[in-house]
From Swiss-Prot:
Family: Belongs to the peptidase S14 family.
Stated name of the protein: Putative ATP-dependent Clp protease proteolytic subunit-like
Role noted for this protein: Has lost the two conserved residues (Ser and His) proposed to be part of the active site. Therefore it could be inactive.
Listed NCBIfam families: PRK12552.1
GO terms classed as biological process: protein quality control for misfolded or incompletely synthesized proteins
Example of a GO cellular component annotation carried by this entry: endopeptidase Clp complex
GO molecular function terms attached to this record: ATP-dependent peptidase activity; ATPase binding; serine-type endopeptidase activity
InterPro entries referenced in this protein's UniProt entry, alphabetically: ClpP, ClpP/crotonase-like_dom_sf, ClpP/TepA
Species per Swiss-Prot/TrEMBL record: Synechocystis sp. (strain ATCC 27184 / PCC 6803 / Kazusa)
Highest taxon listed in the record's lineage: Bacteria
Length: 225
């Protein structure tokens, strides 16, 4: 007599119910990546949150390329990036640069879709999706700004940090200029103060390509050659 193991349903009698997989795994199965919190850099905060957000996002993107390099990836963004709502830094811009580089490195087309908000470096990540595949839901808010940092310590440490801030700002301007078609001078001027954009304004600015009302409006995958 052959005995076959059968996994019970996720729902049923409490005594026999098996725990469902975590939500991230369910989304990943459908090739969906979700950034729904800031990009923290502090190890202490990462331990409190229980996750290294940047590491998880990059690992998911790399896995999806390995899984199928031709199928599109859907990257939903609802994040304040490397800062709080106030603009105070909670992470280094290098966290966001790593995600942008990964988006450009992998082969699958990546739909970046803003839901809720994309602020600062999160807006930069939004703009780094595959051209023609960058979108926002109609009532989201997209914000361009710079992190406010308060360097502490010895004078030499403050000088080193100041150089890093200037270098990161320049890198962010270069990425945004490449993604939007705006000049670095215009971007620097607009980002001197918090710069709010509606999805329609973000489309005109070059941060996204379309405003979505439903999933049916997502662009169709490109033919594999």
């Amino acid at each position: 007599m052959e005995i076959t193991a059968v996994q019970s349903s996720y729902y049923g009698d409490m005594a026999f119910k098996t725990p469902p997989p975590d939500l991230e795994s369910l989304l990943l199965k459908e090739r969906i990546v979700y950034l729904g919190m800031p990009l923290f850099s502090s190890d202490e905060v990462k331990q409190q949150v229980g996750i290294d957000v940047t590491q998880l996002i990059i690992a998911q993107l790399l896995y999806l390329q390995f899984d199928d390099p031709d199928k599109p990836i859907y990257f939903y963004i609802n994040s304040t990036g490397t800062s709080w709502y106030t603009g105070d830094a909670v992470g280094f811009e290098t966290e966001a640069f790593a995600i942008c580089d990964t988006l450009n490195y992998i082969k699958p087309p990546v739909h970046t879709i803003c839901i809720g908000q994309a602020m600062g470096t999160a807006a930069m990540i939004l703009s780094s999706g595959t051209k023609g595949y960058r979108a926002s839901l109609p009532h989201a808010t997209i914000v361009l700004n710079q992190n406010r940092t308060g360097a502490q310590g010895q004078a030499t440490d403050i000088q080193i940090r100041a150089k890093e801030v200037i270098s990161n700002k320049q890198t962010m301007l270069e990425i945004l200029s490449l993604n939007t078609g705006q000049t670095q001078e215009k971007l620097a001027k607009d980002m001197d103060r918090t710069f709010y954009l509606t999805p329609a304004q973000a489309k005109e600015y070059g941060l996204i390509d379309r405003v979505l009302e439903s999933p049916a409006e997502l662009p169709k995958p490109m033919a594999v050659i």
